[in-house]
Structures are given as C-alpha cells and as structure tokens.
A protein has these predicted regions:
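Short, well-structured N-terminal submotif of metal-dependent ribonuclease cores
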Residues: 1-40, 55-69, 147
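Active-site neighborhoods of divalent-metal-dependent phosphate/nucleic-acid chemistry enzymes
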Residues: 61, 80-127
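Short beta-strand segments at enzyme active-site cores
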Residues: 39-42, 126
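Short, conserved active-site loop motifs that form the nucleotide-linked donor/cofactor pocket
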Residues: 36, 80-81, 138
C-alpha cells in the first residue's frame, strides 16, 4: 500500500524534539518494513522547508542547507513515489472546495488531498487527521493510533 505524507508527519519524523517523533518514526519504519511505500507531493516539501527554518518556531531551526538536504532525501527516497498535482488533481481540488464549502484556510490541505487522491493514494500519514476527515476518499493514519 502507498501512503501519502502530510507535512505534519514529515516534521514529526525529522525533528527529534517533536512530541510525536518516536511514534512517527516507529510507524514509518513499520510500514516500510512490511513493503509499503510513501507518496510525497512537492507542496509538502516546500512547507517542510518553510517550517523547519523558521526562527520563530524553533530555538534551533535547521539551516536552509540541512532543510534542503532532508527535503531531497524524502523526494529521492527509493521507497517514495513522487506525486505531482496534475490536471485531474486541480479539477478535484475545485470540486471538493465547492462540494464541502471549504474556506481559504482549507485550500492547501484540499489541494494536497486532491493531489494524492488523483494519484490513487487513499491513505494519509498525518498528525492533523481532522483537517482531512471531510474527504471520504482518504483514510488518515495518525501515528498514535497504530500499534
């Protein structure tokens, strides 16, 4: 099975001080060990780099070089499928924004969900499952709920 990754999950895996680092790392390891794959969209990596280099969020943010190296590692990982938002994803994004009457604060999550769904990804690794519950087509797997 292929699982899309949300930025919140990537942050938890990469930031050792993150409250859910151990759980996220364990879950990722378990999924990969059983042969599952991860799907990653470019917007996740852009948000990751933006967040981890922010001096207002962290006492010791990553340097841009470290952030970019980690981003490239996710993008080029053998167990990762690169997923780009193609025409069908944009159509689905517009449809879902209207169907679910979502506002401006839901734009990026909706585009991410549509990008993954258009690539036949139906599972999402996230720490923010409530942001995606409106999309029946995706099942969210929060790290704390896996044993």
């Amino acid at each position: 099975m292929t699982h899309g990754v949300d930025t919140s999950f990537v942050l938890a895996v990469e930031i050792v001080e993150h409250a859910h680092h151990v759980e996220a790392l364990r879950l990722l390891g378990e999924l990969l060990a059983r042969g599952d794959r991860v799907a990653i969209a470019p917007q996740v990596l852009a948000e990751f780099v933006h967040v981890v280099t922010d001096v207002r969020r962290f006492q010791r943010p990553f340097s841009m070089e470290i952030a970019l190296n980690k981003s490239e590692r996710w993008w080029n990982a053998a167990e990762a499928d690169q997923v780009l938002p193609k025409d069908v994803a944009i159509t689905l994004f517009h449809s879902w924004m209207r169907r679910y009457q979502l506002g401006r604060k839901r734009v990026l999550d909706t585009l991410l969900a549509a990008t993954y769904r258009a690539a036949d990804v139906t599972s999402l690794l996230t720490l923010n499952a409530t942001d995606f519950t409106v999309f029946d087509e995706l099942s969210c797997i929060p790290p704390l709920e896996i044993s």
